[in-house]
Regions:
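A solvent-exposed interaction/effector surface
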Residues: 1-211
Length: 211
């Protein structure tokens, strides 16, 4: 049976609908950076998605390729994730200013993926999918201490969940700890093309520190 990160790391992918504190281990991702409204047809965000999935599936399907990846095990491709920020010193997000978004869209990779394996997968996906993958990168992220919560509902309703997370953290002696390396993080467990907005499930995660 294929290894499923969502099942093996339930505390990271299936948190409660109530806020909680978690320490997130370092992870590797295939990632694409960009700017602009994620809903814009033909925008940078929409264009990034096939690049990410192309590389992720090239690694997954390497079991059928001539290349042997050391330590390989079959896995379910993890959900799409995103790190988001705007040009605000406090790290907060203004959902009314979607054109001002900066993002790193990404998909988690198994730890067995080396730089050489990644470069091979990029070349493989570029050849098979006829894609320009020059924007794709191998990203290592160490989030560390965070507050997180499962948000259920439309993206534009996220501020209410974030307010609850902020209050929960403050009551326990934590403060937000946003920086260039520690960002607003979302994990998308639902496909918005197939799911009603009120049923969307999104893990929201924010970096924190003890006061």
């Amino acid at each position: 049976m294929a290894y499923d990160f969502k099942k093996e790391f339930r505390e990271l992918y299936r948190p409660s609908g109530k806020p909680g504190v978690v320490t997130v281990p370092p992870m590797s991702y295939v990632a694409v950076r960009g700017k602009g409204d994620p809903n814009a047809e033909g925008g940078e965000y929409q264009n990034a998605l096939p690049l990410l999935y192309g590389v992720a599936y090239a690694i997954k399907m390497s079991k059928k390729a001539p290349r042997e990846i050391e330590g390989y095990f079959d896995f379910v491709v993890p959900p799409l994730e995103g790190f988001w920020w705007q040009d605000r010193a406090d790290g907060e997000i203004d959902y009314a200013r979607k054109d001002d978004f900066n993002f790193i869209s990404c998909i988690r990779l198994p730890d067995f993926v080396t730089r050489e394996d990644f470069d091979w997968a990029v070349s493989e996906a570029a050849a098979k999918k006829k894609l320009d993958l020059s924007a794709v990168e191998l990203l290592r992220v160490d989030e560390g201490l965070c507050v997180q919560c499962m948000h259920t509902g439309p993206y534009d309703d996220e501020p209410a969940t974030i307010d609850a997370m902020r209050a929960f953290a403050a009551e326990r002696g934590y403060a937000p700890d946003f920086s260039e390396a520690r960002l607003h993080h979302e994990i998308y467990l639902s496909d918005p093309r197939k799911c009603a907005p009120e049923k969307l499930k999104i893990v929201i995660r924010h970096p924190i520190k003890l006061i």
